[in-house]
């Protein structure tokens, strides 16, 4: 009976994520401060992951605004942070002394903001298929999280790239600065 209940929960999760992916509304764009989005997502996970170091490093100390949908972008960073935490937890199973670390580095030029997210988890197994719907390397994964993230970033006129890193994973996001 427990197996059936777990499968029902998994199917509900898959249906909900598929619905989100298929019917994702267009973003409602307005001037937002990117720091607010990042701080909100980081704060959410800091509370429940006290043994994890979560840092935001800004090269430019002034406020940075983008034309974005705060709810959509919050979803992006919550999803990416969740994936990083899961990757760190998986690596901790092999190395219990590992001190988990996630760093968000923010830099700008005249036109774009660049957000680099680095973690010291297990890293990506396959970056070529990572944003294809239903591709997953997780036992409980639906393969829709990163395609949704990619779609949201693209809908904001941005770009997202995933890299294998010798020490974990690296994600680079660029978004146009509000003008």
Roles of regions detected by a PLM:
Residues 153-154:
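Detector for a conserved hydrophobic position within an alpha-helical segment of the HATPase_c
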Residues 24-27, 65-68, 137:
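Conserved micro-motifs of the catalytic ATP-binding
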Residues 28-42:
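A conserved beta-strand-to-alpha-helix junction within the catalytic ATP-binding
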Residues 145, 149:
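Short alpha-helical Gxxx[C/S/T] motif in the catalytic ATP-binding
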Residues 124-134:
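Short conserved segment of the HATPase_c
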Residues 86-108:
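ATP-lid-like helix-loop hinge signature
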């Amino acid at each position: 009976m427990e197996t059936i209940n777990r499968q029902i929960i998994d199917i509900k999760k898959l249906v909900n994520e598929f619905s989100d992916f298929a019917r994702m509304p267009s973003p409602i764009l307005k001037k937002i401060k990117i720091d607010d989005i990042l701080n909100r997502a980081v704060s959410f996970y800091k509370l429940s992951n006290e043994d994890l170091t979560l840092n935001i490093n800004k090269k430019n100390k002034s406020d940075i605004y983008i034309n974005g949908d705060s709810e959509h972008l919050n979803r992006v960073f919550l999803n990416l942070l969740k994936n990083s935490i899961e990757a760190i937890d998986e690596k901790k199973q092999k190395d219990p002394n590992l001190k988990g670390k996630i760093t968000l580095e923010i830099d700008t030029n005249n036109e774009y903001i660049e957000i680099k997210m680095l973690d010291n988890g297990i890293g990506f197994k396959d970056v070529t298929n990572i944003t294809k719907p239903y591709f997953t390397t997780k036992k409980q994964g639906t393969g829709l999280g990163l395609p949704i993230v990619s779609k949201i970033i693209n809908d904001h006129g941005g770009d997202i790239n995933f890299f294998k890193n010798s020490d974990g994973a690296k994600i680079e996001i660029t978004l146009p600065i509000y003008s």
